[in-house]
Amino acid sequence: MALKKDFVKFDKVDKSYDGKVLVVKDLQLDIEEGEFVTMLGPSGSGKTTCLMMLAGFETPTNGEIYLDGKAISSIPPHKRGIGMVFQNYALFPHMTVYENLAFPLRVRKIPKDEADKKIDKALSMVSLQGFASRMPGPVSYTHLRAHETRYD
């Protein structure tokens, strides 16, 4: 039987957005070509961050990511040959637009006054200032897309 080589490899990968809190810590993951892998975990556990790093939309704070044996952490997304379909709108239906936007900031332990400023700025950038207290259900598809706004 021939030895299979790792097709995707996360080698001791860390990711921090603020330089303090690690959202991905010491990830060691080896995926063989043709292998099917499912990442499971609660909201805020780093699943999407790992996929964003693999696709090149985020960079690891430490460690290296390999694709077919080649280090790719410094290669821009358009040169990696990886397609990415962003996750379905993972909004909490029991929380307002504001609370949905605040959730990842709370996970990252951003102080409330700083989080409020970031949320106000994000809502303003996508012309949704008046939607902060609404539930996501009555928000249109276009507005749902705006929820994917990045803060950094």
Which residue stretches match the model-derived regions?
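The feature captures the beta-strand-to-loop junction immediately N-terminal to the Walker
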Residues: 40-42
